[in-house]
Amino acid sequence: MHHQRILILDYGSQVTQLIARRVREAGVYSEIHPGDVDDAFVRDQAGQGLKGIILSGSHASAYAEDSLRVPAAVFELGVPVLGICYGMQSMAQQLGGTVSFSDHREFGYAEVRAHGHTRLLDGLADFTTPEGHGMLKVWMSHGDKVTALPPGFKVMASTPSCPIAGMADETRNFYAVQFHPEVTHTVQGKAMLARFVNEICGCQGDWNMPDYVSEAVARIREQVGSDEVILGLSGGVDSSVAAALIHKAIGDQLTCVFVDHGLLRLDEGKQVMQTFAENMGVKIIHVDATEQFMGKLAGQADPEAKRKIIGREFVEVFQAEAGKLKSAKWLAQGTIYPDVIESAGAKTGKATSIKSHHNVGGLPDTLNLQLLEPLRELFKDEVRELGVALGLPPQMVYRHPFPGPGLGVRILGEVKQEFADLLRRADAIFIDELRSTIDETSGKSWYDLTSQAFAVFLPVKSVGVMGDGRTYEYVVALRAVQTFDFMTADWAPLPHALLARVSSRIINEVRGINRVVYDVSSKPPATIEWE
């Protein structure tokens, strides 16, 4: 089945994924592709339910001679087009307008005046001036600007320093804005994008999870047939939902391999086995490889070295178990859409690696198995929605993100069994208190009010006093952040009473720790994880 779809061409903006998420929130399927695709690719999309095209922003300058150009077919297909920031400038330049370098750059909050009545902005305003002008609170991020309209266009929005902050050719359904409607700082942005895809593009909103489950199950059955499938189950959201979906489609043809590297959270192995093996009847091979991983990590203090060791050992253990399943023809992975986008970005040189990612991407070549990725079209929030639809426990589906190397990157320096045991218990206390403490204003638990929370083990000792005696024990740091997209994050303002309870419990219940600190660093400049 071809869903109605919106094609998003990415020119390197850091927030392009947010465009796709906003479109999907409007009930419309969207796909992101690099902005340098050719005309043939764009025309081919027309036969696959294409209803409109969105051109993303970019850190590059449309004014530069070597800047990427929008494929000409975009403006020839007869479908509505929305240009955002760089996308607006490229649209203007290629359709006969003028783009100029601006001495006055706009970065951050701005107030934009809407002009005339266009289908995109009509009736949308955050406030009205005494003169009766509708004003929009938006987020700008540009240096260049459009200084002359292409033929057939009219001004749709303006600011004092950017007279053409939006333009429209409503005969051809071409719209463009200099600001970013995809970010939350643009108050009416979600409404603008929903209006573009639903009213201007005429999409019917045929993208929903119940239909997706039925389609995905049918697709897996057709793809796999009677073959057997193996999947590396980590207990994380992505692999868990992938396992549940594949099991729903092919039942006992699926075998999961659960590798316990000794760096999981408290009782995580038991919970995974109970949920999948006991409650859902999934075939699982449970491998306790704690000694193997700890042995290889001994003496290693460098974060990147630890990540690579854990990734390599996981591949080795998984490979050994998979080799015993002679009839398996497919390797399933919990790859999700952001992974696909980031991989494409890396291939085109648009992505920069901050940390190596722990996954099983190298396995298909070594095992000679075909790859099955049933979640590769979904964003994380959609994966969670799918998990609930498949009957997974909400506590598992809405669990905070957990790194593939596990506690290995939450123990600073060398990983030791003693450190992992102390950290596991301290982390469990922190999470328990977050879940049980309700914020009176929102009525939600502080676990639900934070995007990610965990404890970090610091391999340093501090002096303390317990009873009449002096102690010299380890330090634990607590980290809790709030974020919308994990690209930026603020430290969570946890109540002092909550922090006091967590500190008291850890110091009293976890022998070996006598000091607890709270991390108040935002991202950037800090990252969310410490390593």
From Swiss-Prot:
Start and end residues of each GMPS ATP-PPase domain: 207-399
Native source organism of the sequence: Bordetella petrii (strain ATCC BAA-461 / DSM 12804 / CCUG 43448)
Protein name: GMP synthase [glutamine-hydrolyzing]
Subunit structure: Homodimer.
Binding site for ATP: S234, G235, G236, V237, D238, S239, S240
Function: Catalyzes the synthesis of GMP from XMP.
Glutamine amidotransferase type-1 domain mapped to chain residues: 5-206
A GO cellular-component term linked to this record: cytosol
